[in-house]
UniProtKB/Swiss-Prot annotation:
Belongs to the ABC transporter superfamily. Phosphate importer (TC 3.A.1.7) family. InterPro entries: AAA+_ATPase (IPR003593), ABC_transporter-like_ATP-bd (IPR003439), ABC_transporter-like_CS (IPR017871), P-loop_NTPase (IPR027417), PstB-like (IPR005670). The lineage of its organism: Bacteria, Bacillati, Bacillota, Bacilli, Lactobacillales. Signal peptide: none annotated. The gene is pstB1. It is found in: Cell membrane. It is a peripheral membrane protein. This is Phosphate import ATP-binding protein PstB 1. GO terms for biological process: phosphate ion transmembrane transport.
Length: 266
């Protein structure tokens, strides 16, 4: 296989007015000197789904967590992350506000041990919203957006822990949407779900694309090809190729990308 340090990179570029968030020479170090991400420069288009693919340890989840500063306490992050004209990798950024605008859904569903309703309203109340009518409206809007309202509208005061795994994951999406983010980061959101729940989740994400920008880590290449508009391929901490999903899967430009897509390694 071609040496990753000698491999050419093929990175799609967007016009400035198409971008919602971008990175420039983003590098991540653990323990002070162990580098896990090398000079990643990517631009993300508004209201699209981008899949981040690559083998285990390729750097895709490390990259994703940089976008809303989830790596702050565990790693050193060098480089720039541009969002609305601000480099959000700077120390003067309000990280709490940033995470309202750039929400995250994790690999394993993590509902609060509270009612379905309280899962949605908890953060809203913490931000000072106490108007019951407004809270009820946001609960319904968020659950509808996550394609969950019809399944739970008569169970809002029941424990979220009694829901199925697929429902819990969609609840976590609804919980993030309640804060009105522009961007939703998803770290292998379907990896713990059965095929039926995965299909429902994918349908939900495709519907959300009209209003939100989504960036999703996945090991499932079939999933990436089904629902994403763009795909970035990570290998050993390097972004080697970034293009439309159709091009990545049918006409990859890089030798290592082609080997990965064909299943020569994982």
């Amino acid at each position: 296989m071609q040496n990753v340090n000698e491999a050419p990179t093929y990175i799609h570029q967007f016009d400035k007015d198409e971008q919602i968030i971008s990175t420039q020479d983003l590098s991540v170090f653990y323990g002070g000197s162990v580098q896990k991400l090398f000079n990643a420069s990517l631009q993300f288009k508004k209201k699209t789904i981008t899949a981040l693919i690559g083998g285990s340890g390729s750097g895709k989840s490390t990259f994703l967590r940089c976008l809303n500063r989830m790596n702050d306490k565990v790693a050193r992050v060098d480089g720039e992350i541009w969002y609305h004209g601000l480099d959000i990798n700077k120390n003067n950024i309000n990280v709490y506000q940033l995470r309202k605008n750039i929400g995250m859904v994790f690999q394993k569903p993590n509902p609060f041990p509270k009612s379905i309703r309280e899962n949605i309203t908890y953060a809203l109340k913490a931000n000072g919203e106490n108007d019951k009518q407004k809270l009820d409206q946001i609960v319904e809007e968020s659950l509808r957006a996550a394609a969950l309202w019809d399944e739970v509208k008569d169970k809002l005061d029941k424990s979220a822990l009694a829901m199925s795994g697929g429902q819990q994951q969609r609840l976590c999406i609804a919980r993030a949407l309640a804060l009105k983010p522009e961007i939703l980061l998803l770290d292998e959101p379907a990896s713990a779900l059965d095929p039926v729940s995965t299909s429902k989740l994918e349908d939900t994400l495709k519907q959300l694309r009209t209003d939100y920008t989504m960036i999703m880590v996945t090991h499932n290449m079939q999933q990436a090809s089904r629902i994403s508009d763009y795909t970035a391929f990570f290998h050993l901490g390097h972004v080697l190729e970034y293009d439309t999903t159709e091009n990545i899967f049918t006409n990859p430009k890089g030798e290592i990308t082609e080997d990965y897509i064909r299943g020569s390694f994982g």
